Structures are given as C-alpha cells and as structure tokens.
Amino acid sequence: QDNITLCGASAYEKKFYFNQDFNALPDHVKKELQIMCVLYTEDVGGILTLEFDENGRLQFKTEALEADARYDEIGSGLKIKQLQQDKKELLESLEMYYKVFFLGDIPDEELKKKADTVED
C-alpha cells in the first residue's frame, strides 16, 4: 500500500498542499501543519511532505532538485529531528487520528475500558 500524504510544502513553488481527506481536522491543527511545513522549506529549502505509512506512522519525506545549492541536507535532518521533538504531541495525535479513522484501529486504552465494562 502506498503512503497517504497528509500535507506538504515546496520552496520552489512557494506552495502548501493539504490533503482534503483530512479536512475534518480542527483548523488550528491544519494551520500548525501549514506553518511547520512552510517554515521548514523556507529555512532548509526543497520539498517536505508528511505521509502516513501503512502502519499509521507519520513520516517526514524530503526531496530537493539536484541543482538546488541552497538545500541543506544535514540541516534538513536536524530540522526534522527538532520538529519531531517540538511537535511530538501534535504528531502523536495525528497518528492516533489516522489509525482510528483511516485504519479502523481502536486504541489500547479504549479496548481496556470496553473489557472493564464487560466484566462489571
């Protein structure tokens, strides 16, 4: 199964893309994703996309044109690590949202609650 793109930004086209399949996300979350992606591409260059893999994990994918002297590959890796730390709660929430609404997974806590109510 192919990865599902959540959003992305391009330093070349100066554009932000948001997958409308995720339109049910709160506006403040969409705005935060836009700011995060656009600032990344303005800082490092290239193209950044956030994609869900088949297990529901959010992946940061980067690419750059070969002729892009401005693109900083080392800076890119560091910036992604920083974003993954700074935005940890947001990213984990997005993964949970995807797993529940797109993959049909029920979180362990919910299963435990259901099991507890059955036993009562």
Residue ranges and their predicted role:
Residues 115-120:
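Intrinsic disorder/low-complexity signal
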